[in-house]
Swiss-Prot record:
It is found in: Cytoplasm. One of its GO terms (molecular function) is citrate CoA-transferase activity. NCBIfam families: citF. GO terms for biological process: acetyl-CoA metabolic process. PANTHER family: CITRATE LYASE ALPHA CHAIN (PTHR40596:SF1). Gene3D superfamilies: Glutaconate Coenzyme A-transferase. It catalyses: citrate = oxaloacetate + acetate; citrate + acetyl-CoA = (3S)-citryl-CoA + acetate. Keywords: Cytoplasm, Lyase, Transferase. Oligomer with a subunit composition of (alpha,beta,gamma)6. This is Citrate lyase alpha chain. It comes from Klebsiella pneumoniae.
């Protein structure tokens, strides 16, 4: 062999970057060992996986939130990182929810220095609103997160991705195993772009595990853990079916708007939100679709059991699923061939070569607040505290032909229709209709909708009239006092800054 290499060097002068052949296993040493060849990705513990990943202080770690309120990966991994002495990390989870309150101590102790997320709720949201972090949290939409990753601003060093099961080479999906969560649309983006991908799995299955949402050629390391998530808690939080008469009234009115909008025809497409009223619209649309002999071409989302029901009844031909919102959706993804998993890039990224939200006819979304310019707040409560998520709100509002916001006029003694929202997440230019329990308002820029709805005999109000009625019922709210300190920056889906969130003054 040495003689052959020497002869080759005499016959051919190697340019810079080229080296002579040195043997089958010279650059693939694992091929020399049968066990190493097949099991080189498997780690005996989470600590081993972290050490092998090459993670260092100051780097960026990422997670997905497909398990929502049942997620166990974020807290498990960050606790281990703290135990191992890591500091100044950037945490980039596709979203954070109530269950992630243990991060508070890790932020205080310097383990986490910066956060990118779509949502903040519960104790974590309260503490960050009170000034917990030195660096403002970066709030992004689901599509906007992909844009930040693709632009290089958000560069993921190590992605820790929880999956119900996988094979020893890393082929994984979210709709198999005892803890199935459904679509891994968020995780697929991280698996594609992270420098190192670590899978945390509950179960091993035989190779090859297909269909694979995350493929073997994307995975560096795998570690088995006891639990990655509780599938029973996927529906916790913002996702809820309703029997509330007020919300059902709003849903019924929203379905009427869809029916007479001009978009309700054979082959239309739709997405429903996760709030009580916006989710309930699906019930009322079913009757109208049957009565008019209409079948939808596709449903997009965030797929829920109500959408699955319409699909299995033949009323929606295809479901495009970037996140499964309940067990029925996870089951359907495994069983129904026309229930298709898509990545968040395909779902809603403005940098995508083809985002499905741009094919939407109708989207129904909820809101914490909406103002007289149709701007929508889904991030902060009436007290100015972080308690929501940007989600796909601005993405789908921008892409859909018809964006309907469903919200009560007031919640308790708090107006939902206001002069100016506390936090602008979705700009009014992409919002078309507001449906409340006291009336319907159409964005004046959509004269076509105004004409269609009036022709159908649907009474309309101006949004200013709704705002004044809300104020009459609740009184004029006392303005919230904020300090100058910015605790969060709201990024629009294209990466631009659309608003900032400041520390509430009495939270010092």
């Amino acid at each position: 062999m040495k003689e052959t290499v020497a002869m080759l060097n005499q016959q051919y002068v190697m340019p810079n970057g080229l080296t002579p052949y040195a043997g089958v296993t010279a650059k693939s040493p694992w091929l020399a060992s049968e066990s190493e060849k097949r099991q080189r990705k498997i780690c005996d513990s989470l600590e081993t996986a972290i050490r092998r990943s090459g993670l260092q202080n100051g780097m960026t770690i990422s997670f997905h939130h497909a398990f929502r309120g049942g997620d166990k990966v974020v807290n498990m991994v960050v606790a281990k990182l703290a135990e191992m002495g890591f500091r100044d990390l950037t945490l980039a989870s596709s979203s954070l929810i109530d269950a992630h309150w243990p991060l508070i101590e890790h932020i205080k102790n310097g383990v986490i220095r910066q956060i990118y997320t779509s949502g903040l709720r519960g104790k974590l949201g309260e503490e960050i609103s009170a000034g917990l972090m030195e660096n403002p949290v970066q709030i992004h939409s689901h599509g906007g997160r992909v844009q930040l990753i693709q632009s290089g601003e958000l560069s993921i060093d190590v992605a820790f991705l929880g999956v119900p099961c996988c094979d020893e080479f890393g082929n994984a999906n979210g709709f198999s195993g005892k803890s199935r969560c459904g679509s891994l649309g968020y995780a697929r983006v991280d698996a594609e772009h992270a420098k190192c991908v670590v899978l945390l799995t509950e179960e091993w299955v035989d190779y090859p595990n297909y269909p694979a949402s995350i493929a073997q050629d994307q995975v560096d390391l795998i570690v088995q853990v006891d639990e990655v998530g509780d599938p029973q808690k996927i529906t916790a939080g913002a996702i809820r079916l309703t029997s509330n008469p007020r919300e059902l009234l709003i849903a019924r009115q929203a379905a009427k708007v869809v029916e007479h909008s001009g978009y309700f025809k054979e082959g239309f497409s739709l997405q429903t939100g996760t709030g009580g009223a916006s989710l309930a619209v699906t019930r009322f649309l079913e009757d109208k679709m049957r009565r008019n002999g209409i079948t939808a071409s596709f449903g997009l989302g965030g797929i829920t059991g109500t959408m699955v029901d319409l699909h299995e009844k033949g009323l929606i031909k295809t479901l495009l699923d970037t996140q499964s919102f309940d067990g029925d959706a996870a089951r359907s993804l495994a069983q129904n061939p026309n229930h298709v998993e898509i990545s968040t890039n395909q779902y809603a990224s403005p940098g995508s070569k083809g985002a499905s939200c741009e094919r939407l006819n109708v989207v129904m979304l909820s809101a914490l607040e909406i103002d007289i310019d149709f701007n929508v707040n889904v991030m902060t409560g009436s007290n100015g505290v972080l308690r929501g998520a940007s989600g796909g709100h601005s993405d789908t509002a921008a892409g859909a032909d018809l964006t309907i916001i469903t919200a009560p006029l007031v919640r308790g003694r708090i107006p939902c229709v206001v002069e100016k929202v506390l936090t602008r997440v979705t700009p009014g230019a992409s919002v078309d209709v507001l449906v409340t329990d006291h009336g319907i308002a159409v964005n004046p820029a959509r004269q076509d909708l105004i004409d269609n709805l009036r022709s159908a005999g649907i009474p309309l109000m101006t949004i200013e009239e709704l705002q004044q009625r809300a104020e009459l019922l609740t009184g004029k709210p006392q303005p919230i006092e904020f300090t100058d300190r910015v605790v969060a920056v709201v990024r629009y889906r294209d990466g631009s800054v659309i608003d900032v969130i400041r520390q509430v003054k009495n939270s010092d």
